[in-house]
Amino acid sequence: HHDVHTLCTLSDGMGSGVKANILATLTSKIISTLMIGNAGIDECVETISETLPVCRERGIAYSTFTIVRVKHNGEVYTAEFDGPEFVMLRNGVLDEPEKEMRVIGGKEVWESHFFAEPEDMIVSFSDGVIHAGIGRLINLGWKRVNVMEFIQRNYDLKMSSRTMTRNLLEVCDHLYEGEPGDDTTVATVRIMPRTTTRVMVGPASSA
């Protein structure tokens, strides 16, 4: 969270386990730190390419990312690299913002710019979500269209972003039968009007 915007970054490192976690954590940290300092996506991608440790087995440094930045005036910027596309609901209905692709440092990054409306919900997730159930309850896994249908069907106007995230993770855990075959990460952003809280502080009553 920043004075002029709120930033949400989701990353998924190559492979699984500790190595993947390190790659994802570094990627998210680099993007968050640079963008809070008003750096652009070009600088973020270049820094990631120069910073991530190279895998000895595969000989590359790799991590997907999805960025959602919401300014306090409602302007939204998103950037996605090589992960599943985020799912957006507006008034409880699926909505697909217009996107443009740019090649940055050899990577195809999809960007979008739009203005949010109250109660918009943006759900980002790693490919562990769409791979849920492969070879188990669903032979070919859970497709993105299935994820979209689930999100829309389970959406409620009063639902928090945490609840949507938990619901999606729970159904993935069910499809994996409690044994995830891939790292599964979900991040949800819900647009809400700013509210004011007043706190009164004073000496304790002598009574």
Per-range role (PLM):
Residues 1-3, 96-135:
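Acidic loop->beta-strand submotif enriched in PP2C/PPM serine/threonine phosphatases
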Residues 18, 89, 125, 132-134, ...:
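Short helix/loop capping segments that flank catalytic or ligand/cofactor-binding pockets
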Residues 9-11, 78-81, 198-201:
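Beta-strand scaffold of nucleotide-dependent catalytic cores
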Residues 21-92, 109-110, 159-194:
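Catalytic core of PPM/PP2C metal-dependent serine/threonine phosphatase domains
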Residues 14-16, 83-86, 94-95, 130-131:
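Short, surface-exposed beta-strand-loop junctions and turns on beta-sheet-rich folds
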Residues 12-13, 83, 121-129, 183:
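DG-centered beta-turn motif at the end of beta-strands
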Residues 1-51, 115, 123, 135-147, ...:
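Primarily the active-site beta-strand->alpha-helix module of PP2C/PPM metal-dependent phosphatases
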Residues 130-207:
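C-terminal catalytic subdomain
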